A protein has these predicted regions:
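Ser/Thr-centric signal marking residues that sit
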Residues: 22-24, 63, 98, 119
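Hydrophobic beta-strand-centered segment that forms part of the acyl-chain substrate-binding groove
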Residues: 49-58, 62-105
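HotDog/MaoC-like acyl-thioester-processing domains
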Residues: 2-13, 92-141
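Short, intrinsically disordered, mixed-charge
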Residues: 33-37, 72-76, 124
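A generic structural signal for short beta-strands and their flanking turns/coil linkers
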Residues: 13-15, 19, 27, 37-39, ...
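Catalytic strand-loop segment that frames the active site of acyl-thioester-processing enzymes
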Residues: 1-58, 140-141
Length: 141
């Protein structure tokens, strides 16, 4: 990934960053190991088949973590920090789904070098699986 240099003053409403990834079986297992979330819906196919989902689904936070990539891509260099992130999980994500995460600037708050952003994650069918809002603070040059 490339993180281009971008000054705070160069941001405009509508600026966006995108990252896409296909969710794999290994992603679920690695995320379960790293996060400690070993809930059977994510790691046990036999159990997951008995649920309303019919198969294992990705952890919500695994899918949401793609927004960390888009937030960083949007900020560029010098970077910044995420101050807040709200999320609504709208649809399940299955192994094999290809997700597209987007962070888009909706408001510029110059007094504290902050950006209010809309964040979305959609699947390969164009269905919105996560929506939310991020508050990012850009570092000075």
């Amino acid at each position: 990934m490339s993180y281009p240099e971008k000054a705070f003053e160069a941001f405009a409403v509508g600026d966006r960053a995108m990252f896409s990834k296909t969710i794999t079986d290994a992603d679920l297992l690695l995320f379960a190991a790293v996060s400690g979330d070993q809930y059977p819906l994510h790691v046990d196919e036999t159990y997951a088949k008995t649920t309303r989902f019919g198969a294992r689904i990705a952890h919500g936070m695994l899918s949401a973590s793609l927004l960390s990539a888009t937030n960083g891509l949007l900020l560029g260099r010098p970077g910044g920090i995420s101050l807040a992130q709200t999320l609504r999980f709208l649809k399940p994500v299955y192994v094999g789904d290809t997700l597209e995460a987007i962070t888009e600037v909706v408001e510029i708050l110059p007094e504290r070098r902050r950006l209010r952003c809309r964040t979305t994650v959609t699947n390969q069918r164009g269905e919105l699986v996560i929506e939310g809002e991020a508050l990012e603070q850009k570092d000075p040059a």
